[in-house]
UniProtKB/Swiss-Prot annotation:
This is Uncharacterized protein R408. Pfam families: DUF1796. It comes from the Viruses.
Length: 223
């Protein structure tokens, strides 16, 4: 794979970042790597509005303490022995499972400041990719097919394309986890409209956030 190709997770869970890391394809720390983002509409909103719509202090609400989601000290899975985290959620449904080792009640808290600084860097890096002159491969693993529509997918693709400059190009991979075998009559026409997208339907039952049931090497490298 050329060094001029960058793979970018758009959620919806940590599984994409995990698979990119396993395959040695994860080169950057980016906003959607280790968070849970429920739907494509929220991804569009965040990309348009940046960190303030994602992690601004007033947007965050504590959900629970977890012993199943380690706090990641670096961008690698797993990079820590700290298996206790505090799960926060923002107002548009994004959940943060791996960022907070403790609760916080102020935007001056060192825990929140560290979180904010980390994600501002990741957003700056994310936006910078669109003028990098490289080939950007965006991957979205969609877990809520009932909320998916042609219009929402088109909105995301058109937004990403509109941000490109400096001969930067794009590929878009959408994997739809679809154990209920929902029909998507718009897929063929969408793939004809955009010759740089690939849509995979996964009808298997959920078997873990890692998504090891799919051949990610083939999905990602045979574009």
């Amino acid at each position: 794979m050329s060094n001029d190709t960058l793979f970018i997770s758009l959620g919806s869970t940590c599984g994409i970042a995990y698979q990119l890391q396993k395959l040695g394809l994860k080169k950057e720390s980016l906003p959607f790597d280790w968070v849970k983002s429920d739907n494509i509409t929220s991804i569009c909103h965040i990309i348009k509005n940046g960190f303030d719509s994602f992690g601004e202090f007033s947007q965050l609400e504590l959900q629970r303490q977890s012993t199943k989601h380690p706090v990641l000290e670096t961008d690698d899975w797993i990079s820590t022995e700290n298996t206790v985290s505090y799960v926060y959620r923002n107002k548009i449904g994004t959940q943060f499972f791996h960022d907070f080792p403790d609760q916080f009640d102020s935007e001056t808290s060192s825990i929140y400041i560290n979180f904010k600084n980390k994600y501002i860097r990741r957003f700056d890096r994310f936006y910078g990719l669109f003028s990098s002159g490289k080939k950007l491969v965006f991957i979205r693993d969609e877990f809520k097919p009932n909320k998916l529509s042609r219009e929402s997918v088109e909105e995301l693709i058109d937004l990403l394309v509109s941000m490109l400059s400096n001969n930067t190009t794009i590929n878009f991979i959408l994997c739809i986890h679809n154990p209920s075998n929902k029909s998507f009559g718009w897929i063929d026409s969408l793939e004809k409209k955009y010759n740089f997208i690939k849509i995979i339907i996964d009808n298997n039952k959920f078997n873990g956030w890692q998504r090891d049931n799919l051949n990610w090497k083939e999905i990602l490298l045979n574009e």
